[in-house]
């Protein structure tokens, strides 16, 4: 089967010129050149919304017009009179198929025009890229997909009689015009020449590859005031269709370079143990903690500048120590306390708290050594059921031998308010007698430091001397229904219980829901708090007030109800 030879391009493709003789005997030559060829377009379709659905041909076609004047017998010496020639020009664009097709017998003309938009353009005299007249078509759309080419027709309106054609009759300028009777228009248009563009493809909406960036010619024309839409980025196809080889514009690289701008920044999601607290001086974090180090930090008295509140400072295994007072202790002390870390260390590296070997002058007056009375309040504000603050949920790592899970008493949550005092033998004896029936639970200061072992007796050696709180912990008491400190409605016990020594107290029973120091201007060394090492909760101060004062109940942010005694009126 013989192959069909390729179609020859028309003679007036891309460039076309024509000459004529004027009345003065001058030879005028018109030259049209398609400076910017159309390459692609998206079919806008037909229907009610097609007028609003404009899909312009990309890039917009630009046709250049230049006019030359010469002697009829000398074509070598031509003068460019494009700017000096006095006439009106406009260019009319039509659409035709790239491959002519024979009309069938039963097929009629198309019901609707295939080319839409603005097919007419006036001349614009520009200085760049060169001095000439330019026709710009920024709003041309094609309704159906296929292979087409544009045909541009130049029309001229003559203003000077001397520039008219040689064979045309002379118009009668002196004839009077009758305004009452309509007459034919005096001005008329002359067709000069036609130029065609190269074939371009109109794609369907699914196959349309997209729009490329505006060309340099479009930018130059737009800079001189012409109406041309400028695209500064590639708007290529966003779908994943397979690209054809006849289209060179590929947006895979363009979208690959800027895909990170629109991607959710979740490439690195650090856990709570990896996120160091901003106020911490350490750069490492112990990942063995069940809770993140930044979730345990709460504002303490030292953070607010209250350094003189020494009764709030106590020694606990869960408290962190600053590295400053560490060198004053002996190496044996460091070796004794080097194996225990606190969940409140805020990511500090190997912080120890030498409790039994306190110097004569308390070293915990600095803000870094001040014990914050908010140990685990940040992650537990709900009522405790007795098993919430065990060896694992209180912030301690479970495998550590320092805090056995089967310990019968004296857990972190079961400790009453403590007070840090200089080492005194009588106070230590009184504390051991009042706190527990086991005399070996708390060693004296004369006991030499021994290596720590995972036993309950050795675990208590890290506790400082204790001081009995006067008035509240002198004897165990069970709140009853007749007691004014027992809430019948909610069943909450307003005072701490100390009689259940063999069972672990809950966090609420030990600390209370509102036990926070330095609130409402209260101080621990005031007269209404004698010999108190730590501020009681508000309902724990009920015995110090008279029964005639009213109670105030309000709801906290976590939804719990809190009762307070109204202040005395002057």
Swiss-Prot record:
InterPro entries: Velvet, Velvet_dom, Velvet_dom_sf. Gene3D superfamilies: Velvet domain. Its main location: nucleus. Signal peptide: none annotated. Residues 278-287, 336-354, 363-395, 427-445 have a biased composition (Polar residues). Pfam families: Velvet (PF11754). GO terms for cellular component: cytoplasm; nucleus. Residues 505-526 have a biased composition (Basic and acidic residues). It comes from the Eukaryota. Residues 1-24, 39-60, 266-491, 504-541 are annotated as: Disordered. Transmembrane segments: none annotated. The keyword Transcription regulation applies. Residues 454-493 are annotated as: PEST. A motif (Nuclear localization signal) lies at residues 39-44. GO terms for biological process: asexual sporulation resulting in formation of a cellular spore; conidiophore development; negative regulation of conidiophore development; negative regulation of sexual sporulation resulting in formation of a cellular spore; positive regulation of asexual sporulation resulting in formation of a cellular spore; positive regulation of gliotoxin biosynthetic process; spore germination; sporulation resulting in formation of a cellular spore. Residues 315-335 have a biased composition (Low complexity). Disruption phenotype: Reduces sporulation capacities on nitrate-containing medium. Results in the abundant formation of conidiophores. Leads to a reduction of gliotoxin production. Decreases the production of fumagillin, fumitremorgin G, fumigaclavine C and Glionitrin A. Also reduces protease activity. Component of the heterotrimeric velvet complex composed of laeA, veA and velB; VeA acting as a bridging protein between laeA and velB. The C-terminal PEST domain is a region rich in proline, glutamic acid, serine and threonine residues that is required for the light-dependent regulation of development and secondary metabolism. Belongs to the velvet family. VeA subfamily. This is Developmental and secondary metabolism regulator veA. It comes from Aspergillus fumigatus (strain ATCC MYA-4609 / CBS 101355 / FGSC A1100 / Af293). The lineage of its organism: Eukaryota, Fungi, Dikarya, Ascomycota, Pezizomycotina. The gene is veA.
